[in-house]
């Protein structure tokens, strides 16, 4: 899988529609195939500025939106015709329920739901300096043992944290950076001086 997803909370509407699509895909035994169809649709949505504008615009009628979404689905060469039909019907439901503006979020939430069903997670790592491959492997191994699944590391370097790491996995954050420790020390010293010590 090219993408993995963290556990950062999504809007409830996105989650509910994504879960409904996931449940349908599971019932039909088409989770992986539908995931590819969603990926194809999202690629078109990301690349077509007119379609992006259309999806976000409140100025089109539901009838026009249904027609355009059907046309878009007809023109995407889905790997599996059944998955394309399920996605097309799902887009129709979203459109009829006036949720087209949430389309991108819903489809990304579906991808995330599929990744979670495979126990795949994404961790954001901020380091003061680049990690070597051994450090990356150790960190990945520790995080995988914590979550009980596959963890993909997204590592960025920020020299401003001075040292240590900031790890974000889902809604949790572990901050072992030197900057955070200095900030804590500063607060403790201010408190002590305010207390008269």
Swiss-Prot record:
Domain of life where this protein originates: Bacteria
Statement: the UniProt record of this protein carries the keyword Disulfide bond: no
Subcellular localization, as worded in the UniProt entry: Cell inner membrane
Gene Ontology molecular function: any one: proton-transporting ATP synthase activity, rotational mechanism
Cysteine disulfide links: none
One protein family per Pfam: OSCP
A cellular component term, taken from the record's GO annotations: proton-transporting ATP synthase complex
Membrane topology, as annotated: Peripheral membrane protein
Keyword terms: ATP synthesis, Cell inner membrane, Cell membrane, CF(1), Hydrogen ion transport, Ion transport, Membrane, Transport
Protein family membership: Belongs to the ATPase delta chain family.
HAMAP family: ATP_synth_delta_bact (MF_01416)
Subunit structure: F-type ATPases have 2 components, F(1) - the catalytic core - and F(0) - the membrane proton channel. F(1) has five subunits: alpha(3), beta(3), gamma(1), delta(1), epsilon(1). F(0) has three main subunits: a(1), b(2) and c(10-14). The alpha and beta chains form an alternating ring which encloses part of the gamma chain. F(1) is attached to F(0) by a central stalk formed by the gamma and epsilon chains, while a peripheral stalk is formed by the delta and b chains.
Known role: F(1)F(0) ATP synthase produces ATP from ADP in the presence of a proton or sodium gradient. F-type ATPases consist of two structural domains, F(1) containing the extramembraneous catalytic core and F(0) containing the membrane proton channel, linked together by a central stalk and a peripheral stalk. During catalysis, ATP synthesis in the catalytic domain of F(1) is coupled via a rotary mechanism of the central stalk subunits to proton translocation. This protein is part of the stalk that links CF(0) to CF(1). It either transmits conformational changes from CF(0) to CF(1) or is implicated in proton conduction.
Name recorded for this polypeptide: ATP synthase subunit delta
The organism of origin for this protein: Bartonella henselae (strain ATCC 49882 / DSM 28221 / CCUG 30454 / Houston 1)
Highest classification ranks of the organism: Bacteria, Pseudomonadati, Pseudomonadota, Alphaproteobacteria, Hyphomicrobiales
Gene coding for it: atpH
